[in-house]
Every structure is written in structure tokens, then in C-alpha cells.
Curated annotation (Swiss-Prot):
Predominant localisation class: nucleus
Composition bias, Basic and acidic residues: 694-707, 744-759
InterPro entries xref list: Beta_Casp, CPSF73-100_C, MBL, Metallo-B-lactamas, RibonucZ/Hydroxyglut_hydro, RMMBL
Gene: YSH1
GO biological process: mRNA processing; secondary metabolite biosynthetic process
Identification of the protein by name: Endoribonuclease YSH1
Residue numbers binding Zn(2+) 1: 84, 86, 174, 195
Higher taxonomy: Eukaryota, Fungi, Dikarya, Ascomycota, Pezizomycotina
Length: 833
């Protein structure tokens, strides 16, 4: 018994339909795919290209740190969006603008642009984030300064349209100025989170979900996979406990941080704690960064972009400063009481305990690496990692608590020793300091990320910015949630340079504007009513992926287009067809045609000189035709309301119409009718006239008494024309009918065996006798030869002329021969009497 088909099986055919490439979203990771670092993603849809971020990998040097820009033509990029100023998201932007064929526009928020200028300039001076002195920088400081004016700054919650691409930035909560971007291309909404945080901290606004917008594709980070953060209060308490314990044992605390971002949050925490605990105020807190002073100025400038806590603190301190008569207004939320800025280590008196926040956060080079190599040999000191550590960096390595670390900034310091093996370049330093980690990285954890994805409710999720094992765990978790959903969420985690294509089919809706919008739509029609809704025609205009239907006269107002009317004319001459025949042919094809009022001559007698055959030889009529120099209009018709047909006395027909797609097709059809009006059988029959001739014709058709040989000759001619002269030959041996009464041979079963056998010579004689009788029989009925043999290549067929049976071992060839023979019989019939 047949089983019932499932709905999924019935919809399989529709799902397998080919997809138009223009309806596919192409996503390509040039960096940040199954890794953290050098984030760079490409989005292509409907011929538009958006590039997301342009970072460098902190663990690599030179060109190896760049995204795989050679795998994509950057000249096709329309818009480049930078989510925030961190090295792994923005550091290769000067290279893109100065060293590639990129011709698009670059956007970032105002705080990001302000910080980006100083951050990249400092990174170039330090060595372009390279710990290898032999590596050449990928761009210079001058490249950065020259390309900086190309960057355009935008505000949160403002929508901008560039090349039909709509972008809207939203707060991301990661660092000051960090943005999530809503990108709309042809009605497809793509939401890119960048690095984002949903945690309420001391100075940043947490990430928000766009309200009232249906997101089709969500591109989100997966830095921590499904791991969960310790609650914020517990982390702060544990951090301060570790710092105070190191200070109490007489050590120094090194906290490697990015120059901007989490460092400011940690400074707020430390300054608040020091203010509440006077016994620790004797230990100085340093913020060591070349950008320290400039960074604080930027943070003081963009207080309005921070959360309510900072704004409240700013108002309180400004009020206190005003009450105390401080006209300079010093006392804002970023004017710390217990923290000192340290531009470089030359002014640092390394005596006694202290807390040092130093950049860069990955400990690859710079002040943080120099202090690590200086303080690592002492067990009193401690290193506290507060941010995310990228694979391959010293920050990631030291978390494994190795016994030794490689010296980069201080190769000749005391206590260092060279590696065995004679490698003079690598110098090792013993590590005895403590190492602890407390995450203040401002990235969402697994729970927050999953809740955010569920809140967005996008049918397609693309995971980026995460190590492979973390990303795969998050992907598996998201896919497991599909079990309880009717609409399954598609989750992708592409690798670098792995092209991802996702089909998106959307209904195309046109907005009716102008005069056409005044037409009332048809009311609901009951099944018993047969009213036909009115037909609306207009011009369909596409602008920025939006379709509008309007009347041609509204193009200037609603589309900004000027219209031009093109009048087309075509002339042809008919030698035999007159106006009556032309009108009859047009009416037969197009129905009723309209007669134009410009006709100058009466309809009677306007048959045209070419329509009537000159049979009387009247010299006077011939003279009138010869004297007529200017052809006058005989008739004028309007076909299908758009094509004018004018017939003149000299047989010239002129077609005139307004050029457009519909009218051009009708005009082509009219010309096809006119070109065939003189030769079509219907037209010939229409214009024919009855007549009689007095010729003396023989009463008997000369072909009536053709002999069988003549008919055979005609048949052979026809077959030779089809198959070739050498491939057709008569068959002289007839096809014998089956023997009757075959049992007569066995009527004397009791006779001797020798009597039952027939001599071989006797059989041949009997066969020849039967063949001769068959040939005589065929001759009597008028068949000269039994059959015809036809050979083409390795195929052969025999046609028996009595019943026109075709014998061949090739069925297709036999069918072909049978069709040709039947046609030959029709031509030469009757063959045989």
C-alpha cells in the first residue's frame, strides 16, 4: 500500500528551483573567520558591496597581520564601516585607503574617528604593532595622516543612504564610540554587531536592539562561545583582592590594557576603591601610555555619548567645582584623584609597590612588554590580565604560567640567559611573578549573546570573531534551540576566504503614484459576479531598489525623468496587392480596423492600379498611369489604435507609429502581414477571378496509361533523391509466402528414414520453382520487381512493393524509410493497378 507523502517531500521540488544570483547574499570573511584578530568581512547583495572593519592581527607582523585583501577586488566596495577603534578592527584602514584600489566611502562614529587618529599614529611609531625589528611596516605615519580626511563621521541613530545602501549605527557598549550597524540593501536588513557588550558598566551605554525593524541576517561575534562571565560585582571584588594582596607583599601590579577602552573602566574602578580605602592611597596608580593625556581629553569631550552614571557624575563634579570657585572646570568624571598619567618609563621611579596600567594589552611590545620583562623575575610582583587574549600573543602565553619568557625589549638585562643551541637572537627571562585573569573585556558571554540572538529573531545568523572551538560550541547550542521552533534558524560559521551564499527571495511590490493612484481599486467581487477589473497600464520605474508605477506624463514629477516621443516610419511597395486586399488581410489578422479621416478620395473606384490586372490593353488607361507623377493617398487605416497604414496609388504603403515596446511589436506584425499578402494562398484565392480558356487539351491525361516500369522508375528517382543513387537498388528475389500443409511431408511416418529425407538438389529446384511462380504472380498484378533495397552506411532496409512492408534490423532507420516510401506513394500514386 502506498504511503502518504509528507509535506516536506511535496515542497522539495520548489526548494530545488534554481536561484537567481542577484537574489543571493554573498558573505566573505577576509579576516576574523574562526579566529580573533584582523576582522574584515564582505557583504554583496543586488550588485552592492559593503565592507565591515579593516583590522590587523596582533599576533602577526607585516603583511601577515593583514586580512586576505588579495582574495577580493576592493574597487567594487561601495561602503566601508568601522565598528570601533581597536587594532584588530581598524588598524589596516590606512593600508586599504593608501595601498589598494579601494574607491568607496568610509564611515565611523565621531568618538571612533577622534581616537582612531591618535591610536593608529601611536601604533605606527611603536613599530606598526610589530615585535620583529626586521619586519617592514605595511604603511607609514604619513599614509595614515593623508588618508584620515577620507573618513566620514556619523552619529548614532542617524540613517545615511550611499549608493542605495542605507546604514544606521547603534551603540555597541564595547568601547567609547563602538557601533553596531543596521544595513539595508534592496529591502534586506543586515545587522552587524561588531564587538558588543550588554553589561551595565560605569561609563558606557549597553548595546541595544533596533526597535520596529525585522532583521533578516545577524552577523555577531562569538568571542567567548558559550562561556559565562562571573557577575560584575564578584569580578570587581576579586580583582581588588588580587591587587591589594600583591601590594601587601611588597610587589608591583602590572595590568596590560589597551590604551583606550577597558582601561578607562578599570581606572574608574581603581579610583573609586582608592577613594574609599585610605590605607592604599600610599600606593600610586599609573596609567602608562603614550596616548594617556590625549585619551583623557577625548573621553572628556564625549561625555554626552556615555551612560547616565557618567553624566550624573559629571554634573555633580562640575557643580562642586563651580561652588569652590574653580573656573577651569577641573573635576569632571575623568579627572582622577589617585591616578597619574605616565608618558614613558624614563620618568618612572621604579621603587616600592604600585599599580601600573600599561599598553598594549597583548604584551607584544611597548611599555607593557618592557615592564613585564623587568618585573617577571620577582615572585612578589603580579600580572593581572583583564581583557581577551588573542592566540599567539604573549598575553595568551603568560596565562599558561611558563617558567621562562622571551626577552624582546630588554635583551641585555641582568638575569636573562640565552637559549641553548647557540641561537643568539632569543634571550629568555625567568618568570616568577604571579599571573591571574579577570575578564573585563566588554564582550558578551555565551548567555548574553544567546539572549541577544533570540531577541533579534533573525532567520539567518553568521558567527564571526571567535576561536574555532568557541564558535563551534556556540553554533551547536544555537542549532539545538531549533528543536522547539517552527521556523528554523540557519547558523553559519565561515572560515577565512570561504564564500557563503544565502538565497533571499522577496516579493517585488510597486507603489502606484500620480494619476494612476486616482483610479479606484476594484471592490470585492462575489463568485457569482462576472465583472472584469479595469486594466491599468503605466511606466514601471526603479530607483534605489524601489518600484513605482506611474503614467508617462508623471515621469518628470515623480521620477525626475524627461520623456521624448519617437515616431517611427516604414515604407514598402506592393506590386500586385491593392487597397481592398490590404484591408482584407489586416482585418483578418487584427480584427476591425479604423478608417482615418484623412482619406482624400472616395472609396468607390479605389482598387488601385496594382490590384486589378490589366487585361483589356486599353491605351488610354496606360497613358493615365504614365502621366501620374505624384502618388496620391488612396486609403488610410489605424491598426490596433497605434499603427497608421497609408496606401498610395503607386502601390507604396507607409506605416507610422509611436515607438515603444508594445507598438513596435504590433508594427512588426503589420509588416509581416503586408509582406505576405501577395503570396499567401488565402490572399491569392481572395484576389482570384473566374475565367475560361479555349485551349484544345487532350481528353486523356498522358500519365494515365503509365506502365509499371515507368512507375517503378519514378519511385526509384524519388528514393534516390532521398538516400543517394548508389544506395537504392531493386530486389530481384521475391519474398516467399509460408508453406501450407507442412504436415503433408509427415503423412507416411512409417516409411523408411531414407525416404523421408529430400535430396539437396531437389530442394533447390523446388525453391527456384516457388520463386519463379511468385515473380509471375507479381508481374500479373503490375509489380515489375519484388522490392527495393536501401542501404545507408551500415544500415539496410528492404521495401516489399506489394504491401509496402519495410524490413530492417534498425527500427529507427525502418521508420524513416517507411515515412519516405509513403510520401513517394503519394507523389507517384497509384503505383500498381
Amino acid at each position: 500500500m502506498a504511503s502518504k507523502r509528507k509535506a516536506a517531500a511535496m515542497n522539495a521540488a520548489a526548494a530545488e528551483e534554481p536561484v537567481d544570483p542577484s537574489d543571493e547574499l554573498m558573505f566573505l570573511c577576509l579576516g576574523g573567520g574562526n579566529e580573533v584578530g584582523r576582522s574584515c568581512h564582505i557583504i554583496q547583495y543586488k550588485g552592492k558591496t559593503v565592507m565591515l572593519d579593516a583590522g590587523q592581527h596582533p599576533a602577526y607582523d607585516g603583511l601577515a597581520a593583514l586580512p586576505f585583501y588579495d582574495d577580493f577586488d576592493l574597487s567594487t566596495v561601495d561602503v566601508l564601516l568601522i565598528s570601533h577603534f581597536h587594532i584588530d578592527h581598524a588598524a589596516s584602514l590606512p593600508y586599504v585607503l593608501a595601498k589598494t584600489n579601494f574607491r568607496g566611502r568610509v564611515f565611523m562614529t565621531h568618538p571612533t574617528k577622534a581616537i582612531y587618529k591618535w591610536l593608529i599614529q601611536d601604533s605606527v611609531r611603536v613599530g606598526n604593532t610589530s615585535s620583529n625589528p626586521t619586519t617592514q611596516p605595511v604603511y607609514t605615519e604619513q599614509d595614515h595622516l593623508n588618508t584620515f580626511p577620507q573618513i566620514e563621521a556619523i552619529d548614532y541613530h542617524t540613517t545615511h543612504t550611499i549608493s542605495s545602501i542605507r546604514i544606521t549605527p547603534y551603540p555597541a557598549g564595547h568601547v567609547l564610540g563602538a557601533a553596531m550597524f543596521l544595513i539595508e540593501i534592496a529591502g534586506l536588513n543586515i545587522f552587524f554587531t561588531g564587538d558588543y557588550s550588554r553589561e551595565q558598566d560605569r561609563h558606557l551605554v549597553s548595546a541595544e536592539v533596533p526597535k520596529g525593524v525585522k532583521i533578516d541576517v545577524l552577523i555577531t561575534e562569538s568571542t567567548y562561545g558559550i562561556a559565562s562571565h562571573v557577575p560584575r560585582l564578584e569580578r570587581e571584588q576579586a580583582l581588588m583582592k588580587s591587587i591589594t594582596s600583591i601590594l601587601n607583599r611588597g610587589g608591583r601590579v602590572l595590568m596590560p590594557v589597551f590604551a583606550l577602552g577597558r582601561a578607562q573602566e578599570l581606572l574608574l574602578i581603581l579610583d573609586e576603591y582608592w577613594g574609599k580605602h585610605a590605607d592604599f592611597q600610599k600606593y600610586p596608580i599609573y596609567y602608562a601610555s603614550n596616548l594617556a593625556r590625549k585619551c583623557m581629553l577625548i573621553y572628556q569631550t564625549y561625555v554626552g555619548a556615555m551612560n547616565d552614571n557618567i553624566k550624573r557624575l559629571f554634573r555633580e563634579r562640575m557643580a562642586e567645582a563651580e561652588a569652590s570657585g574653580d573656573g577651569a572646570g577641573k573635576g569632571g568624571p575623568w579627572d582622577f584623584k589617585y591616578i597619574r598619567s605616565l608618558k614613558n618609563l624614563d620618568r618612572f621611579d621604579d621603587v616600592g609597590g604600585c599599580v601600573m596600567l600599561a599598553s598594549p594589552g597583548m604584551l607584544q611590545n611597548g611599555v607593557s612588554r618592557e615592564l613585564l620583562e623587568r618585573w617577571a623575575p620577582s615572585e612578589k610582583n603580579g600580572v593581572i590580565i583583564t581583557g581577551y587574549s588573542v592566540e599567539g600573543t604573549m598575553a595568551k602565553q603568560i596565562m599558561q604560567e611558563p617558567d621562562q619568557i622571551q626577552a624582546v625589549m630588554s635583551r641585555s638585562m641582568a638575569g636573562a640567559r640565552r637559549m641553548p643551541g647557540g641561537d643568539g637572537e632569543k634571550v629568555l627571562i625567568p618568570r616568577r611573578c604571579s599571573v591571574q585573569e579577570y575578564s573585563f573585556a566588554a564582550h558578551v558571554d555565551g548567555v548574553e549573546n544567546r539572549e541577544f540572538i533570540e531577541e533579534v529573531q533573525a532567520p539567518v545568523v553568521i558567527l564571526v570573531h571567535g576561536e574555532q572551538h568557541n564558535m563551534m560550541r556556540l553554533k551547536s547550542k544555537l542549532l539545538s534551540l531549533n528543536a522547539n521552533k517552527t521556523a528554523k534558524v540557519k547558523v553559519y560559521s565561515p572560515r577565512n576566504c570561504e564564500e557563503l551564499r544565502i538565497p533571499f527571495k522577496a516579493d517585488k511590490i510597486a507603489k502606484v503614484v500620480g494619476k494612476l493612484a486616482c483610479i479606484q481599486p476594484p471592490q470585492s467581487i462575489h463568485p457569482d459576479q462576472t465583472a472584469t477589473p479595469p486594466l491599468v497600464t503605466g511606466v514601471l520605474v526603479q530607483n534605489d531598489f524601489k518600484l513605482s508605477l506611474m503614467a508617462p506624463e508623471d515621469l518628470r514629477e515623480y521620477a525626475g525623468l524627461n520623456t521624448t516621443t519617437i515616431t517611427c516610419k516604414q515604407r514598402l511597395t506592393l506590386s500586385a496587392a491593392g487597397v481592398d486586399l490590404v484591408k482584407w488581410a489586416l482585418e483578418g489578422t487584427f480584427g476591425n480596423i479604423e478608417e482615418l479621416p484623412e482619406m482624400r478620395r472616395a472609396k468607390n473606384g479605389q482598387n488601385g492600379h496594382a490590384d486589378k490586372m490589366i487585361t483589356d490593353g486599353d491605351d488610354e488607361s496606360k497613358q493615365e498611369d504614365a502621366d501620374e507623377e505624384v502618388a496620391s493617398l488612396v486609403a488610410a487605416y489605424l491598426v490596433m489604435g497605434c499603427v497608421s497604414v497609408r496606401y498610395r496609388t503607386n502601390g507604396e504603403v507607409e506605416l507610422e507609429w509611436e515607438g515603444n515596446m508594445l507598438n513596435d511589436g504590433i508594427a512588426d506584425s503589420v509588416m509581416a502581414v503586408l509582406f505576405s499578402v501577395e503570396s499567401s494562398p488565402a490572399a491569392v484565392k481572395r484576389s482570384s477571378a473566374k475565367h475560361s480558356h479555349s485551349h484544345d487539351l487532350p481528353e486523356v491525361n498522358p500519365h494515365h496509361s503509365a506502365t509499371p516500369e515507368e512507375r517503378l522508375e519514378r519511385l526509384l528517382w524519388f528514393l534516390e533523391a532521398q538516400f543517394g543513387q548508389d544506395n537504392v537498388a531493386p530486389v530481384t528475389t521475391p519474398k516467399l509466402p509460408p508453406l501450407e500443409d507442412v504436415d503433408d511431408k509427415n503423412k507416411n511416418e512409417g516409411e523408411d528414414e531414407d525416404a523421408m529425407k529430400t535430396d539437396e538438389d531437389g530442394e533447390d529446384a523446388q525453391l527456384q520453382e516457388r520463386q519463379q511462380k511468385e515473380i509471375e504472380r507479381l508481374h500479373k498484378i503490375g509489380i515489375p520487381v519484388p522490392g527495393v533495397s536501401i542501404k545507408v552506411d551500415k544500415m539496410s532496409a528492404t521495401v516489399w512493393l506489394e504491401d509496402l512492408e519495410v524490413e530492417s534490423s534498425h527500427k529507427v532507420f525502418a521508420d524513416r524509410v517507411r515515412a519516405v516510401v509513403e510520401r513517394a506513394i503519394e507523389v507517384t500514386a497509384p503505383l500498381w493497378g
